[in-house]
């Protein structure tokens, strides 16, 4: 189990690292429903690497870039949670928005957002990763049929519902289609933005 300032970030079963994680991380595989021939994905936020392990296991030929702000998190993920860098997975120590702004070399078929900061009051989305300008940067770095999946901690009607609604409305200013998928085992909702105008389900 990995905690930041008392907030649980990652959990897994040592006997089977593909089990025991939060359900919402499985939802990060949904972008491939829209883009089943995806070749390159970007994950913002590493934590204990639940998303990275799943992608490397189920989609071994997909190239994955992970952006993590804190080098200490990357060190712990490698040493204690079995996260590996190899020919299909590269970890970049960088701010997520800065990475998108500097990226001129590649387009991604999917971007998965799970980048949180934390303090004594809990976890929160960094403001600069939740603006219209950020989503425009992300859309520019997506392929024509690219998809953005964003983990938002909150619920529909009660706890942090205002954050969920605000994120949904902001994504809709950039992405023609936005869907929401609540996790059953936690207060997480994954918002999925589809870049293509014909990207409906």
Q: Model-found features: residue ranges?
A:
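A residue-level signal for beta-strand positions that form part of recognition/binding surfaces
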Residues: 1, 88, 190
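Membrane-interface segments at or immediately adjacent to transmembrane helices
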Residues: 1-17
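A short, flexible beta-alpha/helix-coil linker loop
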Residues: 7-11, 117-121, 154-156
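A broad, structure-centric signal for solvent-exposed, well-ordered loop/edge residues
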Residues: 9-11, 107, 200
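A short, structure-level motif marking secondary-structure boundaries and short turns
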Residues: 13-14, 59, 152-153
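The AdoMet/dcAdoMet-binding core of the Class I SAM-like
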Residues: 19-150, 159-167, 174, 186
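Substrate-binding/catalytic lobe of Class I Rossmann-like enzymes that use SAM or dcSAM, i.e.
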Residues: 153-155, 159-201
């Amino acid at each position: 189990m990995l905690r930041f300032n008392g907030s649980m970030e990652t959990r897994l079963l040592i006997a089977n690292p593909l089990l025991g994680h939060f359900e919402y991380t499985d939802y990060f595989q949904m972008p491939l429903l829209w883009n089943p021939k995806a070749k390159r994905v970007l994950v913002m936020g590493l934590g204990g690497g639940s998303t990275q392990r799943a992608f490397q296991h189920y989609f071994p030929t997909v190239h994955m870039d992970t952006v993590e702000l804190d080098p200490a998190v990357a060190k712990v993920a490698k040493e204690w949670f079995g996260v590996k860098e190899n020919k299909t997975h590269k970890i970049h120590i960088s701010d997520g928005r800065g990475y998108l702004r500097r990226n001129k070399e590649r387009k991604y078929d999917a971007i998965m957002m799970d980048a949180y900061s934390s303090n004594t009051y809990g976890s929160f989305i960094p403001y600069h990763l939740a603006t219209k300008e950020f989503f425009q940067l992300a859309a520019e770095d997506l392929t024509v049929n690219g998809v953005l999946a964003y983990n938002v901690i909150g619920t529909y009607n009660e706890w942090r519902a205002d954050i969920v609604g605000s994120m949904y409305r902001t994504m809709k200013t950039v992405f023609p289609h936005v869907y929401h998928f609540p996790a059953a085992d936690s207060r997480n909702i994954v918002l999925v933005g589809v870049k293509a105008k014909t990207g409906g389900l």
